[in-house]
Amino acid sequence: GKTRNYAKPCLYEACLSPKGPSFVCLDPKGELLRDSGRLLEESGYEIRVLDLLHMEKSHCYNPFVYLTNDNEVQMLVTNLFKATTPKGAQSQDPFWDSTASILLSALVYYLYHEAPPEEQNFPMVMEMLRAGEVREDDDSYLSPLDVLFERLEMRNPEHIAVKYYKQYRSGSAKTLKSIQITLASHMEKFNLDSLIALTATDELYLQDMGEKRMALFALIPDSDTSFNFLVSILYQQLFQQLFDSADHKHGGSLPVPVHFLMDEFANISLPNDFEIKLSTMRSRNVFVSIILQNIAQLKALFEKQWESVLGNCDELLYLGG
C-alpha cells in the first residue's frame, strides 16, 4: 500500500546520502519507525518519537516551550480548540466555545508571562482551572484563581492575561460555571496521568529541525483519534518554527531540507492556513507528501480549496486500487 510503496522508500533512500533531508513522519501504528528507525539512526539521524500509542515510551512534548510571543499563544489556543472539536460538529451556540477560549487564553497568558519555566505547561493550566471554583448561589465569592488575577491586576492593570480574565469574569456565576465546563470538555485528556507526564516537559527540540538531520515520528492509533489534537499542535508549531528559522536565521531557506510524510493525512486537524503554507514552503526548503486513500478525503478536508491544495503539489502518485 501507500506506506510500503512510497513512505518507506523515501526514508530508505535518505539513508544512502549524507545530505538526506530531515523527516517529520505521521506514523499510524508505528510501522515506519519499526521498519526504518534503526537504519536512520545508523545513518546519522537523530530520532525523536511522539508516541501516542505507548505514552510512557514517548519523548515528552510541551508546546509552551516553543511560544515566543503573544500571537503564538493565541494561535496555540485557537488550534487546540479547533483540534479538540469533533469533525462535523456544529455548536448550537458558539458563545460557549468563544468564551471558553477567552478563559484558556487568560490562563495560558498568565503562565507564559508570570510562571517559572517548569510551571509553563498544560497540566498547570488544568490546576488553575480547578482552582477557579464558582459558587452559583454566591456571585461575590472569590476563588483562589480570582485572587491570583486580582493580585496581578493590582501589579499591572494592563496585563494581557488580566484583560482576558476580566472579559471572561463579566458573566454571572451560572454563566461562568458553564464556560468552565465547556473548557474542561476540550481539555479533558489533560486529566490523564499519561498525558500529564508527556506534556510536563519537552524533549523534542523542534528548534533543531532544519539545522541537522533529524527524524521525528508521530505515532498515532489508527482506530482512536482522541489524542490526535496533540499532533495538530505539533504541526502548527513545527511550521512556525521552520518558517521563522528560514526567514530570520538562514536568509530564507533552511540548511537541511525538511520533508513531512503525512500518512493518514485526513486524520489530523491541520493549521487554519495550511493551504497558504503549502504554496510558500518550498522556497524555504520545506516539503510535504500528502498521503490519502482517495481524492474524496481531500474534498472533505478542503471543501473550497481542495483544487488549490492539489495544484500546489508538484507530483501526483496514484497507486492502483
For each predicted feature, which ranges?
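Conserved ATP-driven motor cores of ASCE-family P-loop NTPases powering translocation/secretion/packaging/pilus
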Residues: 278-321
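P-loop NTPase motor domains
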Residues: 1-286, 301, 305
